[in-house]
């Protein structure tokens, strides 16, 4: 990776395609460097792991219920038949307030299924301010491609 990465080409590709698949060096550093460049360009950014994401669209944009771990305790007579359900706010709710562009970087995106990746692309097309970068694995140097191109192959 070059010593100085301006991120201009990355930002142009991100704005053109909306959802990118990234292969980053395993030693790290590329994601924070590019996120810093995006923040400098006016984006509001968030970095998350894709593990445990569930339904991406509901998790990111809608109020939804979660079931906390039971930790060996029984919940007889409390809550629903499926156990206690807690309501949580959408994870991108505070970022989508206002007019600023939003960039979401998902780590460990290789655990997501094809349909989940496709729903992330659809979410980017429905919400014009949202840009999603999914880290799909490691590589010796930083490279990226449109998510639609990855799903087509």
UniProtKB/Swiss-Prot annotation:
Its EC number is 7.1.1.-. It is found in: Cellular thylakoid membrane. The keyword Transcription regulation does not apply. InterPro entries: NAD(P)H-quinone_OxRdtase_su_N (IPR020874). Keywords: Membrane, NAD, NADP, Plastoquinone, Quinone, Thylakoid, Translocase, Transport. It comes from the Bacteria. It is a peripheral membrane protein. GO terms for molecular function: oxidoreductase activity, acting on NAD(P)H, quinone or similar compound as acceptor; quinone binding. It catalyses: a plastoquinone + NADH + (n+1) H(+)(in) = a plastoquinol + NAD(+) + n H(+)(out); a plastoquinone + NADPH + (n+1) H(+)(in) = a plastoquinol + NADP(+) + n H(+)(out). One of its GO terms (cellular component) is plasma membrane-derived thylakoid membrane. NDH-1 can be composed of about 15 different subunits; different subcomplexes with different compositions have been identified which probably have different functions. Belongs to the complex I NdhN subunit family. NDH-1 shuttles electrons from an unknown electron donor, via FMN and iron-sulfur (Fe-S) centers, to quinones in the respiratory and/or the photosynthetic chain. The immediate electron acceptor for the enzyme in this species is believed to be plastoquinone. Couples the redox reaction to proton translocation, and thus conserves the redox energy in a proton gradient. Cyanobacterial NDH-1 also plays a role in inorganic carbon-concentration. This is NAD(P)H-quinone oxidoreductase subunit N. It comes from Parasynechococcus marenigrum (strain WH8102). The gene is ndhN.
